Amino acid sequence: MLVNAIRQKVSEVISKAYGSEIEFEVEIPPRKEFGDLSTNVAMKLAKTLKKNPREIAKEIVKSLDEDPSFDRIEIMGPGFINFFLSNELLRGVVKTVLEKKDEYGRENVGNGMKVQFEYGSANPTGPFTVGHGRQIIIGDVLSEVYKELGYDVTREMYINDAGKQIRLLAQSLWARYNQLLGVEKEIPEGGYRGEYLVDIARDLVNEIGDRYKDLWNEEVEEFFKQTALNRMLSSMKDTLEKIGSSFDVYFSEKSLIEDGTVEEVLKLLKNKDVVYEKDGAVWLKVSAFIDEEDKVLVRSDGTYTYFMTDIAYHYKKYKRGFRKVYDIWGSDHHGHIPRMKAAMKALDIPDDFFNVILHQFVTLKRGGEIVRMSTRAGEFVTLDELLDEVGRDATRYFFAMVDPNTHMVFDIDLAKAKSMDNPVYYVQYAHARIHNLFSNAEKKGVKFEEGKHLELLGNEEERVLMRNLGMFNTALKEVAQMFAPNRLTNYLQSLAESFHAFYTKHVIVDPENPELSNARLNLALATGIVLRKGLKLIGVSAPERM
């Protein structure tokens, strides 16, 4: 809100004075003596106008000098313009939050553009890992924020239910089933050794007895494929429910083969003369688009590669009407990006359609020591286990609070701590304190009137808190522009910090001063609205008592 207001005022001045439109930053300066907000617009304009940036800054300041939104405006260093905001402008933020309530922060940036976030996608061959958990939360937060900014968002999970890994899953389950029946069967090379398959096999023995004991044919293979798939997908959805995540679409890789999409795309590529046959396989001319080797689409045995079905999947996304798609992948898949972009180009799909957000890996820490992510063959720390230990709120918040581009160390002890050192506790405690203020006011007979006596707000802690409330929309736009959920958690930490400082230094509920109490309760109420909304966008609760 505040950044938008400053940007609009400055833009009007430079448009009128120089006939220019230019992108520039407005942000909170590093030190409070530099004002409430600062801009580098004069330096940006200096390059275009070939003028001294301080001279440009002086002209801008002169045009804004009489504006009641500012107590004063100062020029710093090479041409930074520092704004000291008026109490009137800051009080207006509180008024706006109280009027808009849960609508506060919403802005129609996307204008209904149809976008898709695809994340959490995995082979349904085992439980979600903590790495999947990080990806799911990144996708959830970005989806929520994009909706808040006026985009038509679809959340989608791609189910890799075709190909050799599903056959290996079926063979692995069949081996476990036979082992329980006393038949020695080896899990195939590259198969799945996790204990979770023993549990499914045990259920099968109870359900069908020895029907498929030491028997393997097409019918048996299909039975074990479907059984394993259904059980794994059901388990994955249970985990998603536990972490508080849901998808609009679960898209089957197998469906792309069954409905003819893969063949349609292969035919399109052949017609565009970007494929060729060699050694009995069909290859895409990746090298015609980027400096990379050509890739196989159809193997010599006639089966499709993952690359082929992935191209078909993204072609179908385009045909479904999405203007932009955002795939969230682990950083180990970065090599797949250029060849996918080459494939999109080969299909004449716009360059800005296909986008990938990469995230780094997760390491768990307990008692100051790194937790071994893998115990014995086929076993690893699952997302379910992490959720059981630290709970949904801490899991979601901790995954959101680290930049996706940074390797994450998830401190289990800190996530469980009921102390102000725990970031999610710190923010939630601010919300609980606010709720308690209103209970306290009622007990002390202080009558609350919403929106009244805001003119009494203006000390240093109140100003910082009001300014931070005015930065909520800016934080949301940073999340969207940088694909960084941590921009929202950083904002909430800052807002909670400024509230705790205000709460600690000042008497908020004072029966001897009901008007000032009202003003401060209104500021607290506005803060609670924004904290609650920010936490909701992350999928974290806002408790009223702690």
Swiss-Prot record:
User: What gene does this protein come from?
Assistant: argS
NCBIfam families assigned to the protein according to its UniProt record, in alphabetical order? argS (TIGR00456)
Q: What is its EC number?
A: 6.1.1.19
The terms describing its cellular component in GO are: cytoplasm
Give start-end ranges for motif 'HIGH' region. Answer: 122-132
**MF (Gene Ontology):** arginine-tRNA ligase activity; ATP binding
Q: List the disulfide bonds.
A: none
| Broad class of enzyme this protein falls into | ligase
Q: Which segment of the chain is annotated as a signal peptide?
A: none
Which reaction(s) does its UniProt entry say it catalyses? Answer: tRNA(Arg) + L-arginine + ATP = L-arginyl-tRNA(Arg) + AMP + diphosphate
What organism does the UniProt record list as the source? Thermotoga sp. (strain RQ2)
- Which PANTHER family does its entry note? ARGININE--TRNA LIGASE, CYTOPLASMIC, ARGINYL-TRNA SYNTHETASE
Family affiliation: Belongs to the class-I aminoacyl-tRNA synthetase family.
Q: What is this protein called?
A: Arginine--tRNA ligase
- So where does this one cross the membrane? none
Places the protein is found:
Cytoplasm
SUPFAM superfamilies associated with the record? Anticodon-binding domain of a subclass of class I aminoacyl-tRNA synthetases (SSF47323), Arginyl-tRNA synthetase (ArgRS), N-terminal 'additional' domain (SSF55190), Nucleotidylyl transferase (SSF52374)
